[in-house]
């Protein structure tokens, strides 16, 4: 086996295995064993990172030379993966107000705990809508791709397996 083929096997195996592992992070709601931070208010529409599945489906992996690279086509992937701050815009404020009115509309006619849950959500949107344009909004880190001890373990396992396969092919 040529070295180029050997390296290609390792890179391809790494791409497949790690892409599957990174995808499972969305199901685990964690970066391997590091749980994601909870949202400030519980949401009735499911997990923050799984509501639409757009971010999860946007992840692509490519082999570039001697490396495997993961990318996403959605603009918010980096801030979700690494955390950070975003500046509130007028457009965001309009969205927050729309979500507030939607939440208070959904609360009408409900009683007890259901009404309280919608009220908490409505108050959250109202608080965001009342923030000034230019204020910073902190986005908590919810890493789904990157370096981790589990990634290192998987890569080592892949390399060891491919070395053993190559040695077995030499001895035949």
Can you describe what each PLM-predicted range is?
Residues 1-172:
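Short, Lys/Arg-rich flexible segments
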